[in-house]
C-alpha cells in the first residue's frame, strides 16, 4: 500500500490578514502520517523583504529574518513565483497527496499557494481541530484554566498557538510566527488529530464548512 505524503505549509504576509499584499516568508514540512520528515524548506521572498520592517504585524520578527539570512538558516529567493515553484517541485518530487495549513482559507486562497489547488488535494487543519480536539472536555477546561478565550469572549480560543499549548501541556507556549516554525507545530497538531481516529473533512475550508454535518465545535466559554 502506497504511503500517503503530506505537505504542511505556512505563510507570513504583509498587508494584514484580510487583504495581504504579499508573502515574505513561505515554509513547509513534507512528512508522513507519523511525523517522519522527508524535507523542509524556509524561503525569504526578497521582493517583499523591505516591507517587513514597515508592517505593524511583521516588523517584530524582522531581526529574526536578518539573523537567519546572515547565518544561512533561511534561503532567499527573488519572487513569490520562485518560492511557489520550489514548494510545488518538492510536492511533486515526494509524491505529496495533501497540502495542509491551519486555516487553508487564508494560505490556500489569499496567497501564492492558492495555485497548489486543485493540482493537490488539501486538508484544513483548523477545520480538523474543530472536528476532533475541540470536542474534548479537557480542551475547554484547559482553555478556561489558562484564560485562552476567543476575541468575542463567547468561546474558547481555537488558534494553532492555543491548540499546540494544549497538546504539549505548555500553557506558556508562544508561536514564533515564522513560516517553517509554525508549519512544524501545525504538523504536530495534525498528527494528534489523526491519532484520535475521528472523522474529518477534506478539500473544504473551515469557513465553507457550514451545517451540522461538519460537526464543528467551538467550545463555549461559559460552563
Please describe what each predicted stretch is.
Residues 2-110, 114, 161:
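Conserved non-catalytic scaffold segment of RNase H-like nuclease domains
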Residues 47-67, 131-183:
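Active-site-proximal helix-loop-helix substrate-binding element of RNase H-like nuclease domains
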Residues 69-74, 116-118, 170-175:
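Short, polar/flexible loop-turn hinges at active-site or ligand-entry regions and domain interfaces
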Residues 114, 166-170, 189-196:
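Active-site catalytic microenvironments for nucleophilic, acid-base chemistry
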Residues 118-134:
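Conserved beta-strand -> loop -> alpha-helix junction used to position metal-binding or nucleic-acid-contacting
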Residues 148, 180-223:
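Acidic two-metal-ion nuclease catalytic site recognized across multiple nuclease folds
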